[in-house]
Amino acid sequence: MPSFDIVSEVDMREVQNAVENATRELETRFDFRNVTASFELNEKNQTIKVTSESDFQVNQLLDILRAKLLKRGIEGSSIEVPEEFDHSGKTWSVEAKLKQGIDSAMAKKIVKLIKDSKLKVQAQIQGEQVRVTGKARDDLQQTIALVRGGNLGQPFQFNNFRD
């Protein structure tokens, strides 16, 4: 029986490249001249710390970061930014988390979406991924299109396709 896995992974090398590109753009932008602003990638915690002198500039830095991530093939929804920024002294900062893996609540949403579609496939939650099996390859391709168009708030990759 053909099957594939639905996963949510972010390539940390691409994230590192995007952060370096954003830092390079930050150094050349006129509106950030003589301003203390930075991007810091923590690969261990999978977070990106954005720091600047005002909350408005932090929002601008987040826009730069999202644009650079998108250019590197990482969707903007793969980072989770808190609503409130931290303020200490004369700097504002925010720590954006990278979404890795599919948590159980999201996996249940995916399985429910697939079951509600009445496609002839079975979906199973296996840790941080969802395995989808079916008799026909066309059903699996329809399932991929369904999950991509599902607007679930997280980017998904489809791998381990077996016939």
Curated annotation (Swiss-Prot):
Keywords: Nucleotide-binding. The keyword Nucleotide-binding applies. Gene3D superfamilies: 3.30.70.860, YajQ-like, domain 2. One of its GO terms (molecular function) is nucleotide binding. One of its GO terms (cellular component) is cytosol. Pfam families: DUF520. InterPro entries: DUF520, UPF0234-like_C, UPF0234_N, YajQ-like_sf. Nucleotide-binding protein. PANTHER family: UPF0234 PROTEIN YAJQ. Belongs to the YajQ family. This is Nucleotide-binding protein ESA_02876. It comes from Cronobacter sakazakii (strain ATCC BAA-894). The lineage of its organism: Bacteria, Pseudomonadati, Pseudomonadota, Gammaproteobacteria, Enterobacterales.
